Regions:
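Active-site neighborhood of thiol-dependent amide/isopeptide-bond enzymes
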Residues: 155-162, 170-250, 257, 272-275
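Surface-exposed beta-strand/loop patches in extracellular or lumenal glycoproteins
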Residues: 43-59
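Active-site rim recognition segments
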Residues: 230, 234, 238-353
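N-terminal export signals
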Residues: 5-24
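C-terminal segment of N-terminal export signals and the immediately downstream linker at the start
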Residues: 18-46, 340-347, 352-353
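Solvent-exposed beta-strand/loop surfaces of large extracellular or lumenal domains
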Residues: 60-93
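Acidic low-complexity segments
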Residues: 80-82, 102-178, 182-196
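Short, hydrophobic/aromatic-enriched beta-strand segments in well-ordered soluble domains
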Residues: 36-40, 51-53, 101-113
Length: 353
């Protein structure tokens, strides 16, 4: 089967063509290399159709993409980027003249654990302003603004880190993980607050942190990705190498004048409480709570921070986020939360030199 490189066909080639300098930089202590494979089989589907896959992105000083390749039969396959958030996306389309055949899309990348850094803000404020704005599922007025105002009123200072910590603590204390929610949740934060039901999964709980932070004047965003390896913290916060088709996870970060983008993950605190059957007061949970305000364990790969956005090329409607494969064939929309029904597997493996 002929192997092709997306790097040779896409306008984004320089983004994913790792230089010798970059490869050397990710060979040092603390870096781990992984391969992530999408194995797609849509051969049972008829009619014209399109497929979109979220891909790893280069991110800060904690994640570097080395290579993205594909093999199979995918007419017009290309690496694309949405024009607003820059989310890297694999796209393929079929005209209906023949059925799709099995396809594999592979990414090789390196990650290292991400602590809070000391970093000056960029002079260009465009990015900060973008991540203060509301979206369809993330309003920053009404009950969201009222709730944020009550929370930060109790903060001990006006510093963004202090106000963000007040919101983080409120999230940990008041939300809970609801295991019956499909996938990672929708992140409809107005509904959560108006209903008084603060249960959900990562895209609900961490979106609530982001929305409250924005309403309090703190730039913040979700980061969508998938777990690719075991955790050194709790077993439930990792995924053994192999089939990670259902290991998607959303995290969050906020912008600080002293530290740049600061990683947080209150949803994983609540996940550990539920799955480890430990109370918030347990010493291991208290330690995790402190750690996850300003730290990400990078047994996970970041895809993008796109929220309520249009795919490229456009799909029938905007998506709340792109963390799962997405496809449209004829009148059918394939739900990436059900890997077997969709026809895909995601497989991860650590690359050990």
């Amino acid at each position: 089967m002929k192997r092709r490189s997306l790097l040779a066909h896409a306008a984004l080639a320089p983004l994913y063509l790792a230089s010798a300098r970059l490869l050397a930089a990710t060979a040092g202590a603390g870096w781990r290399s992984y391969a992530l494979d999408y194995e797609i089989d849509l051969s049972a589907l008829k009619g014209p159709g399109q497929l979109w896959l979220p891909l790893p992105q280069d991110a800060g000083d904690y994640q570097r993409v080395r290579e993205i390749t594909w093999r199979g039969d995918a007419p017009g396959a290309a690496l694309r980027r949405d024009p607003v958030y820059g989310a890297p996306i694999f796209h393929a389309a079929w005209d209906g003249a023949r059925r799709p055949r099995p396809l594999t899309v592979s990414a090789v990348f390196a990650t290292r654990d991400r602590p809070m850094a000391r970093q000056a803000l960029p002079r260009d404020t465009t990015e900060a302003e973008r991540f203060l704005q509301p979206t369809v599922h993330m309003p920053v007025d009404g009950i969201v603004a009222e709730t944020a105002g009550r929370i930060v009123k109790e903060a001990t200072s006006a510093a963004p880190e202090t106000r963000a910590r007040a919101i983080y603590d409120w999230i940990v204390d008041n939300t809970f993980r609801e295991p019956t929610v499909r996938g990672c949740g929708l992140g409809d934060i107005r509904f959560m607050l108006e209903s008084g039901n603060l249960g959900g999964k990562c895209a609900d709980i961490n979106s609530l942190f982001v929305g409250l932070a924005r309403a309090a004047g703190i730039p913040a965003r979700e980061v969508y990705g998938v777990r690719v390896g075991p955790s050194a913290q709790f077993d439930c916060l990792g995924k053994p190498a192999g089939d990670v088709s259902g290991a998607q996870h959303c995290r969050a970060e906020f912008l600080s004048a002293n530290h740049g983008w600061v990683p947080v993950d209150p949803a994983d605190v609540r996940k550990a409480v539920l799955e480890e059957k430990l109370p918030l007061e347990h010493e291991r949970i208290r330690a995790l709570r402190e750690r996850l305000f300003g730290y990400w364990e990078m047994n996970w790969v970041a895809f993008n921070h796109a929220r309520d956005f249009e795919l490229s090329p456009r799909a029938r409607a905007p998506l709340p986020y792109l963390m799962y494969p997405y496809a449209e064939f004829g009148d059918t929309t394939l739900d990436g939360r059900d890997a077997a029904a969709f026809g895909f597997r995601i497989v991860s493996r650590e690359i050990v030199a």
